[in-house]
Structures are given as structure tokens and as C-alpha cells.
From Swiss-Prot:
Mg(2+) 2 binds at D347, D427, E429. Its cofactor is Mg(2+). Mg(2+) 1 binds at K342, D347, D367, E429. It comes from Solanum lycopersicum. One of its GO terms (biological process) is response to wounding. This is Leucine aminopeptidase A1, chloroplastic.
């Protein structure tokens, strides 16, 4: 094999992920900012001007550094693996690929050829490290000119998750060796159709980009990624695979935005900052995305009593109701969709205060994980520009705090459809904000709605930290979303909508209470939301309380962006 060394950069598929800096970095020189929002025709024809303290008055005087998203040139190449030149070569191998003959030589032709070029070092290293191709295994060979990494794919590499893991392992190896130019290949592509190869290349690219990303905005010192280029070898070339790789780059940009929004603490990301981020997305893609932001007075005109009750205590950080609309100027009929995200930028629990070590109150900055996914999807779709859909992105952003003005246990609030809710737990606030958001979404004339919310701890008891729960009374919509998630490599599981449980949600003095008994909490939460969706609208609720955050990495995951984008494109 030719010595691994730095080769000249190639020009194809130049990537500039997240080229527009996040709004989090725009407030470093001025303690105040002001912006004006257009008011929807439902409220008024006038424009309101809002002034809000940020950055200079931030608790702790924290001011984020610039976002440092990966900028990697990605291309599919037909270069033979043994002829490739660069810093690091990563090979994905299944357990079957690692089979040996009676002389302990690889049966796999590519591994056999590589081992021959390396005078048996690949075979020796994999034996010494007990590398058998199992998922999660890897072995590294270092040379004066570079490195080769073998990555285990398990019994078979049949899902996007396997290829994401391969890309992430390659990114980790590149990071540890400070590689600038890397390549990724599969030991065998037998049995992969042309379409499967294209999808595999896209998943590998996704894994490398997201695996290279580190959120260093809040570190006093950070080490920037050295990775500049990725070659994907042996999976084909041409416009189709390049388009799919570009699609992966756009989705990754949305995922990274989602991660940054959730990672940023509540003293940085307030409801107003979420609104400004939405404005920035609309400004960047102004030919296809419009924006309306409603303040508290305008929400009051729309009778959003449930949402405003949650927001009432946060007098220093007032609520903003965000509505983005994606629509290309083509005349063809468009399917009308809505993506609704829970947008609690911080959740103290209110008077039902989150207390004790198990409350995880310190992580309640991630209670806007649904909103982050919705805004990340808006950014990605602004780049991808599908022509046959009209998509409404809706977030009722606010904080759930404690004050004399705040909502109390036992209060009765009225949603914008006239239904009354007895608040028996102020810490079940997300569903109250979503109630008015779902009503608003239905009023846009949409045909289908997906809402995403870090709604219940019960879903984590049922499904653990990595899997979202999907609730819908519509089998067709369930199938659409499950297929989109599978194609994206995100995990979800359809849960039952047990209607008999609704009896436990009835109030003695109002139409309903906002929480039921302890058992089946994820189901009763979904049944609550159903009360605010028009029967003519197909609706699915994703409880993403588990997968929006990685305890292992102590970081946001950007969960939901990929599935939402894939689902929109399939409509």
C-alpha cells in the first residue's frame, strides 16, 4: 500500500456547514438589543418593537464564543483503497468480513490486499487486539505517514445507524491523530444495491460531520478540529451520490443548530433569543421562509390562556410565540404540514418545584429540545427547498418560573379553543403551552402535524434514554414517521393511545386536569394533547424526553431534526 501522507485537497462537494454564525454570538459588544416583528393579520396590521436585555446583563456575565461548526470538504471517489493518499483511512468491517482461511489469512479481498501491502501488519494487529468486526470494536495501526483504523460493523451493516457509527469512529480517530484528510471505505459492498450505496455514503458523511462537531462556545480555551476533507471510497460516484451527500450536509447543519440551542444555558437562550434565531432563519432563506412572532399581548388577543399561564411568572423573560412558514413560489399543489416544538427555555417546575438530586433541574435548559429540533429542521429545509410542501414551524417559547404573578396549583386556565384545564401540577407545563400551539397549528389549515416535546419522565421509564415514544391514532401517519426515523437512523417506538386512561384526566370543576395518576404518564400526556387537535387533522406526538440529551457525552444530540426533514421530504 502507498504510504499514507497528506494529499492535495480536492474541490468537489465543498462544505461550509453553519456558515452563518449563531445569534448567540451577536450580543458581545452591546448590552441591549432591539428588534421589530411583523404581527399576523389575526392580531393587527401594526408592527411592535421589543427591547430586551441580553448578554451585557446576563447572569454570570457569560458571553459565548463564535460557533465552530465543522467545515469539511466531502466527496465520493472511485480511487482504489490501496492507492488512496491522505492522513487516515477508516475501513468498516463486518464480522463476516473478518473471516480467515486455514492459514489465518483474510478471506475478504480488500482486507487481503491491504494486509499484503502492509506485510501482514493488519492481520497481526487485528489478532492481537481481538478485533472480530463486532459493533463498537476498533483497531488502529499507526505509521510514520498516517494511520489505518478498522471499525466493527457487527454481524451486518444493514442500517443507517451502523454507518453513522462508522463515520463517528473515523471522526474520533481523526481527532486523536489531528488528521486533516481522511477516507472511509467498506471492506465489502456485496449485496448493496446502488441506492443502498448512496444512502450508506450519506450516513457515513453524517457520522463524520456530527462526530467532528464540538460545542466550544462556553470554554475559555478550545482545540479546533483539524479535519478538512473526507473521501468516501468504493460506493460510487456521480451526481446522485453527490446530491445525497449535500443533503446530509444540510441536515447536519440543522442538527448542529439544534445541539447548540439545547446546549446553551437558560441565561443565554431565552424566549426572545429563540425568537431572534427564528428571525435569522427567515432572513437567511427569505425567498422561501416567512416569520411571524407574537408577544404576550398578541397571544392574549388570540385567547392563549394555557400558554400565557405558564409564562406568567417569568416577568424578566417574557414569552414569544414563534411561527415560521416554508413555502416555495411554485404553483403546484402543496401538502400543508406543521411541526410544533415545546419551547420551555427553562423549567423550574413552578410552585411544584423540581427538588432533589433526581429532579435534574440543572438540565432543564433542554426542555426546549422539541423547539430546537423544529428550528433545526427549518434551517435544513431552507437549504434543501422541497417544492411540494408548505411547512409551518411553531414554537410557544417561554420559561416556567416562580413568582407572585405565577400560575398556582389548583388554578383553572382556558385554552384558545375554550376548553378549561385545572392545573393540578405546575410542573406539567409543557402540555399547556402545546395546547395553544396545536390549536394555532390547526388554524393554519394544515393536513398533518407532528409535535415534539420533552414531555414526560414516564417515557424514559418505558423506553430508556435513547428511544422516543410516538403516539398517534392514525396508522398511516405512524408508518410514515417510523419509516422516516429508520431512514434517518433515529430511534422511536410507537406507543398505545389507551383511551380508557382519559377517565383519570377528568376534573371535578373544569373540563380536565393537566396530569393523571403516576402510572401511564406518557400515555395520559399524549391523550391530553389530543384534546387540542382538530379531528380532521392527522397528528402524531413524539415524546423525546430521553434522546434529546446524552448523559454519557453531557451534550445535546440534536434528536428529531433528521426524522422531521426526512418525513417532510416524503410528503
Amino acid at each position: 500500500m502507498a504510504t499514507l501522507r497528506v494529499s492535495s485537497l480536492f474541490a468537489s462537494s465543498s462544505s461550509s456547514l453553519h456558515s452563518n454564525p449563531s445569534v448567540f454570538t451577536k450580543y458581545q459588544s452591546s448590552p441591549k438589543w432591539a428588534f421589530s416583528f411583523p404581527v399576523t393579520p389575526l392580531c393587527s396590521k401594526r408592527s411592535k418593537r421589543i427591547v430586551h436585555c441580553i448578554a451585557g446583563d446576563t447572569l454570570g456575565l457569560t458571553r459565548p464564543n463564535e460557533s465552530d461548526a465543522p467545515k469539511i470538504s466531502i466527496g465520493a471517489k472511485d480511487t482504489a483503497v490501496v492507492q488512496w493518499q491522505g492522513d487516515l483511512l477508516a475501513i468498516g468491517a463486518t464480522e463476516n468480513d473478518m473471516a480467515r482461511d486455514e492459514n489465518s489469512k483474510f478471506k475478504n479481498p480488500l482486507l487481503q490486499q491491504l494486509d499484503s501491502e502492509l506485510n501482514g501488519l493488519l492481520s497481526a494487529a487485528s489478532s492481537e487486539e481481538d478485533f472480530s468486526g463486532k459493533s463498537g470494536q476498533s483497531v488502529n495501526l499507526r505509521f510514520p505517514g498516517g494511520r489505518i483504523t478498522l471499525v466493527g460493523l457487527g454481524s451486518s451493516a444493514s442500517s443507517p445507524t451502523s454507518y453513522h457509527s462508522l463515520g463517528q469512529a473515523a471522526a474520533a480517530a481523526a481527532k486523536s491523530s489531528q488528521a486533516r484528510n481522511i477516507a472511509v471505505a467498506l471492506a465489502s459492498t456485496d449485496g448493496l444495491s446502488a441506492e443502498s450505496k448512496i444512502n450508506s455514503a450519506s450516513a457515513i458523511a453524517t457520522g463524520v460531520v456530527l462526530g467532528s462537531f464540538e460545542d466550544n462556545r462556553f470554554r475559555s480555551e478550545s482545540k479546533k478540529s483539524t479535519l478538512e476533507s473526507l473521501d468516501i471510497l468504493g460506493l460510487g460516484t456521480g451526481p446522485e451520490i453527490e446530491r445525497k451527500i449535500k443533503y446530509a450536509e444540510h441536515v447536519c447543519a440543522g442538527v448542529i443548530l439544534g445541539r447548540e440551542l439545547v446546549n446553551a444555558p437558560a441565561n443565554i437562550v431565552t424566549p426572545a433569543v429563540l425568537a431572534e434565531e427564528a428571525k435569522k432563519i427567515a432572513s437567511t432563506y427569505s425567498d422561501v421562509i416567512s416569520v411571524n412572532i407574537l408577544d404576550a399581548e398578541q397571544c392574549k388577543e388570540l385567547k392563549m390562556g394555557a400558554y400565557l399561564a405558564v409564562a406568567a411568572a417569568a416577568t424578566e423573560n417574557p414569552p414569544y410565540f414563534i411561527h415560521l412558514c416554508f413555502k416555495t413560489p411554485t404553483k403546484e399543489r402543496k401538502t400543508k404540514l406543521a411541526l410544533v416544538g415545546k419551547g420551555l427555555t427553562f423549567d423550574s417546575g413552578g410552585y411544584n418545584l423540581k427538588v432533589g438530586a433526581g429532579s435534574r433541574i440543572e438540565l432543564m435548559k433542554n426542555d426546549m429540545g422539541g423547539a430546537a429540533a423544529v428550528l433545526g429542521a427549518a434551517k435544513a429545509l431552507g437549504e434543501i427547498r422541497p417544492s411540494r410542501v408548505e411547512v409551518h414551524f411553531i414554537v410557544a417559547a417561554c420559561e416556567n418560573m416562580i413568582s407572585a404573578e405565577g400560575m398556582r396549583p389548583g388554578d383553572i386556565v382556558t385554552a384558545s379553543n375554550g376548553k378549561t384545564i385545572e392545573v393540578n401540577n405546575t410542573d406539567a407545563e409543557g402540555r399547556l403551552t402545546l395546547a395553544d400551539a396545536l390549536i394555532y397549528a390547526c388554524n393554519q389549515g394544515v393536513e398533518k402535524i407532528i409535535d415534539l416535546a420533552t414531555l414526560t419522565g414516564a417515557i424514559m421509564v418505558a423506553l430508556g434514554p435513547s428511544v422516543a415514544g410516538a403516539f398517534t391514532p392514525n396508522d398511516d401517519l405512524a408508518r410514515e414517521v417510523v419509516e422516516a426515523a429508520e431512514a434517518s437512523g433515529e430511534k422511536l417506538w410507537r406507543m398505545p393511545m389507551e383511551e380508557s386512561y382519559w377517565e383519570s384526566m377528568k376534573s371535578g370543576v373544569a373540563d380536565m386536569i393537566n396530569t393523571g395518576p403516576g402510572n401511564g404518564g406518557a400515555i395520559t400526556g399524549a391523550l391530553f394533547l389530543k384534546q387540542f387537535v382538530d379531528e380532521k387533522v392527522q397528528w402524531l406526538h413524539l415524546d423525546v424526553a430521553g434522546p434529546v440529551w446524552s448523559d454519557e457525552k453531557k451534550n445535546a444530540t440534536g434528536y428529531g431534526v433528521s426524522t422531521l426533514v426526512e418525513w417532510v421530504l416524503r410528503n
